[in-house]
Amino acid sequence: MAITLSNVNSEAGLQKLDEYLLTRSYISGYQASKDDMTVFTSLPSAPAASYVNVTRWYDHISALLRSSGVTAEGEGVKVESTACSVSPTADQKAPAADEEDDDDVDLFGEETEEEKKAAEERAAAVKASGKKKESGKSSVLLDVKPWDDETDMAKLEEAVRNVKMEGLLWGASKLVPVGYGIKKLQIMMTIVDDLVSVDSLIEDYFYTEPANEFIQSCDIVAFNKI
């Protein structure tokens, strides 16, 4: 289903986007895609820290773009001025059957000419940076989240450290309280940029068996060149 986001620079639009990302790591699917880049480039700057979920997503996509870029196609996302809520309520009018975007999810508002120009400039900069292939090593900090408070965190960490490949070295780790008795695993790793794609590592190892028995989601908290 295509997703339509509108005026994500307004307070109302950012709040809706924050609610939308509450249970999601990406705009669509289970890995970063062109949908994320479309929304990312529509934001002229990093969102305020009060938008916790948007900030988490924004920092994650920033890190991915600095590392290996975003290549997945996604499901299709638009940033436009037509407005409707993410979860339509009873008093909202149903879209006409012949409208092209009747299945779209719209986080409302309008985009100004200045915002469009800023988005275009940002898209050009991201596209240019994506073509640069950097060599060397990087230090990465991951947030690995369990399914619930009953998840065995020792086995979760074991599943993470069992991922072995050329150019990957696991480092220090700690458990950080999240709330409601749930803790997340923060773990450092050092990678050789030309050999390890963090996005692929998460998608291919953490979100597949047996690791996905313990891991609900994983986010990149920090990504720094060494």
From Swiss-Prot:
One of its GO terms (cellular component) is cytosol. This is Elongation factor 1-delta 2. Residues 114-124 have a biased composition (Basic and acidic residues). One of its GO terms (molecular function) is translation elongation factor activity. It comes from Oryza sativa subsp. japonica (Rice). One of its GO terms (biological process) is translational elongation. Residues 97-113 have a biased composition (Acidic residues). Belongs to the EF-1-beta/EF-1-delta family. The keyword Protein biosynthesis applies.
